């Protein structure tokens, strides 16, 4: 359960990436879309226009795909503010500047103030690294490559798109239902002229998490079954080992039911001890597994361990049950 929940949490974080607290995306089927095309709905708290593009970075024989994004920083802060590595705010962000995530700059040895060259629309464009950002919010991604933030005016000039945006990200007002809001926007901006979609496909993320955790469910099931079988098949050996104890109990007048009850309490003690010791040990193993899974994801994102109280209770209950069934 914890592996699936942890992986799902990480995938949701990566999938949200640039969108942040926005839940819907609105695009024009052909060309750009303007923010004033959005209907004036009270259920919309913010509509942020975003320009998108792609570039290619070449260094020492390596090619890296760069996703370019640009937006009004004041508006972007409403849904997903970028975080600089030095903790400062983004200021004087105009001209041929670019902000890159720290994982990308560390990989290629890029420092603040360095000039990099990106191939955009077939032309080589020099850009100065204005700042280094943390690998989160708008720079977080679930595919390989990197994301770079450019000034809106610079991006518009490079893409020759000075009027409108690639998409508008919608942040709902407090208490607004996403499905209802989507229907309201779709009614005001009907298909096929506009495309209204949810930013995160929760069903797909949950399905991916189940697929990742299924092998561990099977391993746990077979391990538990084998434990019961091994202990049960060794019943005669255990009985012989307990004969002196049984004889002592019977010699002082203990009935068969009393002896059985004592051994069941012993099983309860062993099961409880195993559960209490196994849970912290399992947390350590879980973190090691998630670390390995995180390295297999693009950019090696760290998957935080998500351990719910229900998972701990189920683990403890299973430990006691195995002891009793054995």
Residue ranges of predicted features:
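Interfacial loop-to-helix junctions that mark the boundaries of transmembrane helices
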Residues: 306-307
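Residues that define the loop-to-transmembrane-helix transition and helix capping
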Residues: 213-214, 244, 257, 310
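Juxtamembrane helix-loop transition segments at the membrane interface in multi-pass membrane proteins
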Residues: 8, 12, 240-252, 286-295
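Small-residue-rich transmembrane alpha-helices
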Residues: 233-235, 269-300, 310-326
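Alpha-helical transmembrane segments of multi-pass inner-membrane proteins
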Residues: 215-218, 222, 228, 261, ...
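Interfacial "coupling" helices/loops that link adjacent transmembrane helices in transporter permeases
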Residues: 229-271
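Membrane transport/envelope proteins' first extracytoplasmic loop
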Residues: 1-225, 237, 295, 303
């Amino acid at each position: 359960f914890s592996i699936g929940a942890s992986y799902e949490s990480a995938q949701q974080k990566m999938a949200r990436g640039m969108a942040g607290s926005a839940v819907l995306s609105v695009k024009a089927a052909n060309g750009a879309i303007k923010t004033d095309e959005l209907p004036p709905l009270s259920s919309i708290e913010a509509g942020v226009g975003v320009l998108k593009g792609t570039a290619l970075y070449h260094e020492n024989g390596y090619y890296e795909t760069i996703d370019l994004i640009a937006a009004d920083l004041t508006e972007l802060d409403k849904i997903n503010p970028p975080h600089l590595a030095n903790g400062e705010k983004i200021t004087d962000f105009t001209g041929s500047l670019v902000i890159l995530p720290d994982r990308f700059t560390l990989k290629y040895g890029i420092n603040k103030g360095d000039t990099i060259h990106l191939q955009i629309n077939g032309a080589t464009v020099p850009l100065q690294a204005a700042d280094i950002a943390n690998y989160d919010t708008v720079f977080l991604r679930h595919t390989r490559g990197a994301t770079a933030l450019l000034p809106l005016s610079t991006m518009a000039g490079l893409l020759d798109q000075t009027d409108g945006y690639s998409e508008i990200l919608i942040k709902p007002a407090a208490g607004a239902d996403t499905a209802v809001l989507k229907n309201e926007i779709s009614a005001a901006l009907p298909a096929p002229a506009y495309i209204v979609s949810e930013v995160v496909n929760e069903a797909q993320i949950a399905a991916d998490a189940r697929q990742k955790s299924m092998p561990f469910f099977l391993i746990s099931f077979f391990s538990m079954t084998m434990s019961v079988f091994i202990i049960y098949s060794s019943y005669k050996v255990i009985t012989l080992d307990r004969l002196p104890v049984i004889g002592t109990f019977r010699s002082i007048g203990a009935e068969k039911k009393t002896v059985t009850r004592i051994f069941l309490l012993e099983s309860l003690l062993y099961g409880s001890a195993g559960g209490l010791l196994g849970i912290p040990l399992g947390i350590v193993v879980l973190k090691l597994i998630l670390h390995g899974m995180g390295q297999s994801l693009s950019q090696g994102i760290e998957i935080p361990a998500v351990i719910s109280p229900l998972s701990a209770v189920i683990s403890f209950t299973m430990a006691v049950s195995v002891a009793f069934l054995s």
